[in-house]
Amino acid sequence: VEQIMPKRAKELMQNENWILVDVRPQIDWCRKHAYPSKNCQYFIPLEVRDLRTFTKQAASLAIFPERVFSSSGYANVEENENFIEEVVEEGLWGEKVILYDDVGGVIGEEMMDFQDGVQTPSLMAIHELVARGFGAENIKHMAAGLEWWDEVEDFEIGSAEQMPMGM
């Protein structure tokens, strides 16, 4: 899987019909996303449904207390069991896709002092897609994610109303 910068992502979208896919929770995508992008959530907000998820949420907040005051509207996330289904429903299976999240992660860039890379949701989503048979040749990873998307000239940021969960 090739890692590319946002400027190259835009070129591939415009000239070679690659599709930009945001893997952040839908609530984040609705607030701000690279335009145009589709949303397939790799993680979803963690809902307190029972004692197990309550314990998980409490432990997470003890480790990451800054999330209590986060503007995201949720304190923690859990893996989306329907991630692959969302990819299929969006008509993306087998298409040429560029995945991103908020910060992008790094794939083993020695010059950036990350010998083994930095794991982020977009990289985890890529791993999941490849493991499930989505051809690696049809996937690119956008380094720096949304954080650098609006730093490049002529890039657009979009927002949308949040869709009800389950749609």
Language-model-detected regions and their locations in the chain:
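Rhodanese-like catalytic fold shared by cysteine-dependent sulfurtransferases
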Residues: V1-W18, Q26-M167
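N-terminal glycine-rich beta->alpha transition that marks the start or flank
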Residues: D22
